[in-house]
Amino acid sequence: MVRGNTPLPGRWGVVIFVLALGAFCRGPALRAQEVKHLTARSFDSGFELSNGTFNGMLAASDGKIYYVLCAENIDTGGQMYSYDPAADKITHLGDLTEASGEKGLKAVPQGKSHVSFVESNGKLYFATHVDWYSVQNDLESMAPPPPGYKPYPGGHFLAYDMAAGKFENFAKAPEGQGIISMNMDAQRGRMYGLTWPSGYFLRYDLKSGQLKNLGPLYRDGEGGHPTKRVICRALPIDPREGSVYLTNADGDILRYRYDRDAIETVQGDNLRKDYLGTWNPITGQDFGYGWRQALWYAPENAVYAVHGRSSYLLRFDPRAERVDVLERLASVPTRRSGMYDEFHYGYLSLSLGPDGHTLYYLEEGAIVQNGKRAVKRGPGGDQLEDLHLITYDIPAARYTDHGAVFFSNGARPGLVNSIAVGKDGAVYCLADIPGKQRRVDLVRIPPVE
């Protein structure tokens, strides 16, 4: 474990020492871990327009896997489903545009949910997002509606009652913004979100019905250079006091104070660590120094987070205001290569398992053949990578790469940005399924030891 706030004069000496120590101590362990193969099963939810999904999953208390399939289509919104492992049955639950009360509006639809569900009192709380984009100069922006259609109305805070099978529509984001990040403080009845593209921080109070916009936190958000800043995708909450934590590409840790209804910058530490590499937060091609995915770990009253591209696991103690760099969760082939991963938009697939202390992580890493990193291209020209299942036992500080994931025909799941771990330890994700007319659907990876 590397302490995050080492004084600057001795920092490089510490880094060199730790790297050397890591090579000595971890090298044999990595060599001992054979890169095995796991065989995954794909499902057919019956939605031919399905597109890439980010988060949008949960293994709920009723044993079912809930998920959203997105659609980049002007006439069709994202669709919500459940999979019952006991019955081996998929059920279509609803259309996100209809759930938002916008059926027949003839506007840009609620094309996706970009957030993980939060379960509370038999309901799944989540938010909707836009899936209607244009790309210019490598910059993604909301596309204008075609003739005869209205602009995107804005993302919604929603809930789904698992027993009644009904949706509730609470509030809509301002200025036609999507909701790209969300979490819920179930104890205090608060939903929080960050909007796209401007990066407004929203809070919605379930009891009063009040939606408050605390303003932009990311300069011009993901709107344009040179003031562009990538918006945080994960908002872990400290249940003890109701504080919400988030980061920016510059490496600052921000804290929403429930007691003051205000946002402040944590002064004791930050994520600008040598271990994470050197990043230009302006480019938008990566996620800078901010965490990509993060969750609250109650046994230690701490946040566990993954940094994008490097896949380093971080631990943040909110009261001590201390960041520790723990372990690189990248696959064994990626770690051996010493390189970052090719795919820029992953690193969201982090979740606690059913035992409450094991982290599960899906990472798209290097393809290695004959001991060397191989470059393979997909039909669209993108570099292919192997999807690996990684686990990290927190109390034991034990990293395990369980191997690359393939379908029975040898094809690779791709574009994985989601994860849910069932009660039996099976790992579910939403992935590109090569050879299918639909692009993305549910995938199951069998339990591992």
Go through the PLM ranges and name each one.
Residues N51-G56, G101-S116, Q177-N183, E222-P236, ...:
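Repeated scaffold domains used in trafficking and secretory/extracellular systems
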Residues V306, S311, M339-I394:
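Loop/turn-rich, solvent-exposed surfaces of beta-rich toroidal or solenoidal domains
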Residues D44-G78:
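Beta-strand-rich domains and repeat architectures in extracellular enzymes and scaffolds
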Residues A60-D62, E119-N121, A186-R188, D238-E241, ...:
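Residue-level detector of Asp-centered blade-edge/turn motifs that repeat once per structural unit
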Residues M80-A86, P144-M162, L313, G378-P395, ...:
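Beta-propeller blade signature
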Residues C70-I74, F126-Y152, L362-D386, I433-V440:
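Short, conserved, GDST-rich strand-edge loop motifs in beta-rich repeat architectures
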Residues R41-G46, L93-P109, E168-Q177, G215-T227, ...:
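Surface-exposed loop and turn segments in beta-propeller and other repeat-based domains
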Residues P413-E449:
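Blade-level signature of beta-propeller repeat domains, shared across WD40, Kelch, NHL, RCC1
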